[in-house]
């Protein structure tokens, strides 16, 4: 079997196509989760912590270059200038994104698994008794009904 033919069979299998669709949808879904965290959750967390903005929390590790034109308090400005920064606030935001995404995927998988379970059917009727048992019952009934 040629390499091209084997690859074609592999690529056109249902699982590979499902995976491709999942990756595309996951990329789009990731954008939604990022927006939820950045625009909805982090402002509430910031409000609860007294206006703390996690996305701009960092520790500067390197010197600021003399040609730097920006705010030394801005994470993005320092990063753009090539200053080494330890951006723990950005990491916290990404971690929250991951946890939300993982939880939503968990719920989706759980829902799909529940759909895959066969419906609980009513108990099936017992199988009919074998012919020899039926014959023995007939004999028993005829003996009961016959005079002695």
Curated annotation (Swiss-Prot):
One of its GO terms (cellular component) is plasma membrane. It comes from the Bacteria. Keywords: Cell inner membrane, Cell membrane, Ion channel, Ion transport, Membrane, Transmembrane, Transmembrane helix, Transport. It is found in: Cell inner membrane. SUPFAM superfamilies: Gated mechanosensitive channel. The chain crosses the membrane at residues 16-36, 89-109. The keyword Cell membrane applies. InterPro entries: Mechanosensitive_channel_CS, MS_channel, MSC/AndL, MscL_channel. It is a multi-pass membrane protein. GO terms for molecular function: mechanosensitive monoatomic ion channel activity. Channel that opens in response to stretch forces in the membrane lipid bilayer. May participate in the regulation of osmotic pressure changes within the cell. Homopentamer. Belongs to the MscL family. This is Large-conductance mechanosensitive channel. It comes from Paraburkholderia phytofirmans (strain DSM 17436 / LMG 22146 / PsJN). The gene is mscL.
């Amino acid at each position: 079997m040629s390499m091209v033919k084997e690859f074609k069979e592999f690529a056109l299998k249902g699982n590979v196509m499902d995976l491709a669709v999942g990756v595309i949808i996951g990329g789009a879904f990731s954008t939604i989760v990022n927006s939820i965290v950045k625009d909805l959750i982090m402002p509430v967390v910031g409000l609860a912590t007294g206006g703390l903005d996690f996305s701009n929390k960092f520790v500067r590790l390197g010197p600021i270059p003399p040609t730097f034109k920006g705010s030394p308090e801005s994470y993005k400005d320092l990063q753009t200038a090539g200053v080494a920064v330890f951006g723990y606030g950005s990491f916290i935001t990404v971690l929250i994104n991951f946890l939300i995404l993982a939880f939503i995927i968990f719920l989706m998988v759980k829902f799909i698994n529940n759909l895959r379970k066969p419906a609980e059917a009513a108990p099936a009727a017992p199988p009919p008794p074998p012919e020899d048992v039926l014959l023995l019952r007939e004999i028993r009934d005829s003996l009961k009904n016959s005079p002695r």
